Each structure stands twice: as C-alpha cells, then as structure tokens.
UniProtKB/Swiss-Prot annotation:
Motif 'KMSKS' region, residue numbers: 226-230
Pfam families: SYY_C-terminal (PF22421), tRNA-synt_1b (PF00579)
Catalytic reactions on record: tRNA(Tyr) + L-tyrosine + ATP = L-tyrosyl-tRNA(Tyr) + AMP + diphosphate + H(+)
Similarity comment: family membership: Belongs to the class-I aminoacyl-tRNA synthetase family. TyrS type 1 subfamily.
Oligomer and partners: Homodimer.
E.C. designation(s): 6.1.1.1
Protein name, as recorded: Tyrosine--tRNA ligase
Origin superkingdom: Bacteria
NCBIfam families hit by this protein: tyrS (TIGR00234)
Keyword Ion transport included in the entry's annotation: no
Domain S4 RNA-binding per the UniProt entry, residue ranges: 340-404
Motif ('HIGH' region): 40-49
Subcellular location: Cytoplasm
C-alpha cells in the first residue's frame, strides 16, 4: 500500500476506499490533488469535524495537494446525511459570515495557503436549473439514490425535495474540482459515502476519468457517546465558544481505553512514541492523557496557548504553579448583600446544571472551596472568604473554577 494511505490506515483514519489498489498505485506514481468539503452551517467547527482535516495534513506531509471546499452554496440547501429532520435554513448573511470564519479557522489549524481554499458558490450560484437537470440530472437514478443510507433513513421522517438535490450538487462539486484542478480523490466522513460514490460516477460518465473516494470512521468514545460532545455541549474549535482550558481538559479526561486511539487520530506523534506512552499503566497513564491534551490543543490553538492551559491544569490538580488560566466567573455582591448562597453561585456560574445536582454533589462530599470540603447545602460565602478577591471552587475531581470579585 502507498505510504500515505498506509499511514492513514495505521492511524485509524481509513474506513472505506474505492479501488484501493488502483489509488495506491496512482499515489506511488504521482502526487495527486484531493479534497474535503465543509458546509458553512456554523461559525465554528467542533472536534468531531476535525478528522478529515487532520488526515489532509498527513497527506500534505507526503506531498499530495489539498483542496478545502467551503460549501457556502450547498449550505443554502442543507446536507441530509445523518440528520433525522431538515436543517434550519440560514440567511445569506449568516452563511457568508460562517464561511469566512470557518476558512480562517481551518487555515490557522492546517497552515494551508489561501489557494487551497475554494467556495462552491464559484460555480453553483450561477447554475441554470433547466440546463443542470438536462446535463447533470440525467446521470442520476432516483432508485439508486434512495438505496443509500442517507436517504433511506430520512424517508421514515420526511425528506424535502430541496434536500434530495444535495447529492447532485455535491457530485457536481467533485466534477468541477476534477475539471478545473484535476482533483482525483474526495475524502470525508463515512456518512458521505453515498455522495462521494455519486460524484465518482458522474465524473466517469461526463469526463471518462477514474476518480476515487475515501471515508473515515465516525469517531465515538468507548462509552458509546459521539466524539465532540461534552456536558457543556459541542467541543468547538473557537475559543470564544469553548474555552481553551475546557478544550484541554476534554482530552485530559479521556477514558483509559480511548487514549491510544486518540493519540493516533488527534496528534502527529510518531508511531513508536504513541505505542510507548499508551502502554503506561495506572497513574502513569495520566501522563499519556496530558500529552494527548497538549498535542491536540497545540494543533488547534497554537503552542503558546497550549502551554498556558497545561500550566493552569497542573496548578489546579497539583496545587502549585500559575493558576491565572484556570477558567473564572466574575461575581459581585450587591449593595444589600452580605453573603451569597453557594448553591446559587454554582448555578449562576454554570458549573452545575441545576440546584438539585449542586445539592447532590454537596451531600456526597464533592464540592470544595479553596481546598476545603463544603458540608452544608446552605453554605454561604461572604466577602471575607475571598482572599485577594477570589476563591477557588472545585466540583468533583475534575471541575475547577475561580470565582473573582
């Protein structure tokens, strides 16, 4: 197998691939152009979206030529893949702003040049519908489209005609990228398999060119939960939506059974180093988790920020060091207040989702103020509790928050 493909396989990226042997031989002979697409449905991607772009970075290191397709036009329709209901229709301004943000985010993470980024509005916005149906639609079988899981699952919930067109447009994207950039490979999540296959078929019928598709497994944690979800919601790559400290802690709290898998997927460490540190036992495995958290934080937010939150994490858990990057909640006593009920402060700061959960944690001995266990549900804080205008609140073993006046 080609070196780059073999690397993707070893690191757990490879789920399905069309004509793997032919693609491998082609990549041995020449450096190919390949692409992954992303729609502008949000102002930020989350960690679950990152897999294709990490794979792109690996392929780029082997000399292959990446294209990131920003689907600003296809966002107007919405991809039905993996969805049980129609996506919210966004305004043109929202889509434009999201596309701008996502491009900047991915350019910062991947370090790809601007010429690697293309918007599909370049060709989709000016399509003539009648001509598109005649020249492109004729090559699609409705029966075959309905056989793909993307549409089969949605038929039970309702599938709009606008969404039914999505596969044609994504296929046309691949066709256009092959035409203008000689793109030979599309990569994406395994839920995109049907769309990718349709694009390959369209190019073969329209241009007589063999192209390829490669998909990645949809990443889940060992507890069965989808990768990229936390108690605070999606683990966004934008620090204004999900703090860098919380991002680091999300990976620092990886379960033991996921450490090796995530080191292969979310870092660029060499195989022998991953094998060494992922085989640590007991408390030593925490070192592997710290390495994992640091490496992926460095990729997404840069080394300087990764060092800051690593130091803050060490300070929180080991009791020494720079604590300034531990997340904080700004609080002020009202003029009439002499004290504040801790349970209310816990809810306001969102360190607990409800008062009942806060009471349960206090009763179980899981809440600490400045390292001292809170014994009473009705515990109150006064100004005197705030040394240097702050206190440190710990909930459970892993949640730390500075309350700052």
């Amino acid at each position: 197998m080609n070196l780059a493909l073999n690397l993707l396989h070893k690191r757990g990226f490879l789920k399905q691939c069309t004509s793997l042997k032919v693609l491998s031989d082609l990549m041995d002979r020449e450096k190919i152009v390949f692409y992954a697409g992303v729609d502008a449905t949000s102002s930020s991607l989350h960690i679950g979206h990152l897999i294709p772009f990490l794979a792109m970075m690996h392929l780029r290191q082997h000399g292959h030529i990446p294209i990131v397709l920003i689907g600003d036009s296809t966002t107007k329709i919405g991809d039905p893949s993996g969805k049980s209901e129609m996506r919210k229709i966004l305004s043109l301004e929202e889509i434009s702003n999201n596309a701008f943000s996502i491009k900047n985010q991915l350019q910062r993470i991947t370090k790809f040049s601007s010429k690697c980024f293309i918007h599909n509005s370049n060709w989709l916005d000016n399509l003539n519908y009648i001509e598109f149906l005649r020249d492109i639609g004729i090559h699609f079988s409705v029966n075959r489209m309905l056989s793909f899981e993307t549409y089969k699952k949605r038929l039970d919930f309702g599938l709009s005609f606008i969404e039914f067109n999505y596969q044609l447009l994504q296929s046309y994207d691949y066709y256009m990228l092959n035409k203008i950039r000689n793109c030979r490979l599309q990569i994406g999540g395994d839920d995109q398999w049907g769309n990718i296959i349709s694009g390959i078929d369209l190019i073969r019928k329209k241009a007589g060119v063999e192209t390829f598709g490669l998909t990645f497994p949809l990443i889940t944690r060992s507890d069965g939960k989808k990768m990229g979800k936390s108690e605070k919601g999606a683990v966004y790559l934008d620090s204004s939506l999900y703090s860098i400290y919380d991002f680091y802690q999300y990976f620092r709290n990886t379960s033991d059974s996921d450490v090796k898998t995530f080191l292969y997927l979310f870092t660029f460490l060499e195989e022998d180093e991953i094998e060494l540190i992922s085989n640590f036992k007991g408390n030593s495995l925490n070192k592997a988790k710290e390495i994992l958290a640091f490496e992926i934080t460095k990729i997404v937010h840069g080394e300087a920020e990764a060092l800051k939150v690593q130091e803050a994490s060490f300070a929180a858990f080991r009791g020494s060091g720079d604590r300034s990057n531990i997340p904080f909640f700004k609080f002020s006593f009202s003029n009439l207040e002499e004290e504040v009920l801790l349970i209310n402060l816990m809810l306001d700061s969102k360190i607990v989702p409800s008062k009942s959960e806060g009471r349960r944690l206090i009763d179980s001995g899981g809440v600490y103020i400045n390292g001292k266990r809170v014994e009473n549900q009705n515990h109150c804080l006064t100004r005197k509790d705030f040394n240097n205008n702050e206190i440190e609140l710990r909930v459970g073993k892993k949640k730390f928050l500075r309350i700052v006046l």
